[in-house]
Amino acid sequence: MSSAPVKVPRYYTVKTQIAELIDGAAPGTVLPTERELAVRFDTSRTTVRQALAELVVDGRLERTQGSGTFVAEPKIVQVRQLNSYTEDLRQQGRTPSSIVLSVTRERASDAVAANLALPPGAAVHRVERLRGVAGEPLAHEVAWLPGPLPRLRQELERRGSLYQTLREAYGIELSRAEDTVETALAGPADAQLLSVDVGLPMLLIHRTGYDPTGRPVEWTRSVFRGDRFRFVAVSSLDS
């Protein structure tokens, strides 16, 4: 028994047509107006508006109030490996930015304690940062670190990279990390920090980093803008 053909929504067809239109266009290229696109694709402005909105969420377009719709910069690709955000982007020739929002000592919650193999209530460092590229905010990150780490804020602000700071200032080397990646929607706090709309699709990543003895030395929660980031996982068969 053959199944009925799937009906493709009109806005999705228009979205595909606009995506083809901007393929190869330079970032910053201005798109025709909604009215012009509606005439070009023989559809309503409402349909065009929905198609454009999805392309904005996908990271293909950017909209500026009063200025129009533009082709967006390509998504930043981050290969998940044992590098810090700062080190990874420097290897790509980009200019990472990092603003330290706070560095505090607190009692570990049950979740933090479990991921760092500590008893609940143990003292940990909490490091909150806003990560970006060339000054554009792209990720909100909170890391929890065990152990005494004197002058952590000063050491971190001097180097920028958390892993470099742990290695050079405290002799802590990371040998492996475990990442969990899932989707999430931007809440009010992340939306305000990252200058995006509430409800924008985000990438939520939890990482646990281990030293060569297998001791957890980092648990990090990172929220990345889904319209600006694409993650790549590289796998290989064991010999």
PLM regions: where:
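Short, cationic-aromatic polyanion-contact patches
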Residues: 7-15, 33, 67-83
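Extended, compositionally biased flexible segments
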Residues: 39, 45-46, 50-58, 62-63, ...
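Beta-hairpin "wing" of winged helix-turn-helix
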Residues: 31, 56-66, 72
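Extreme N-terminal segment that seeds HTH/winged-HTH DNA-binding domains in transcriptional regulators
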Residues: 1-45, 50-53, 91
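C-terminal all-alpha effector/ligand-binding and dimerization domain
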Residues: 96-239
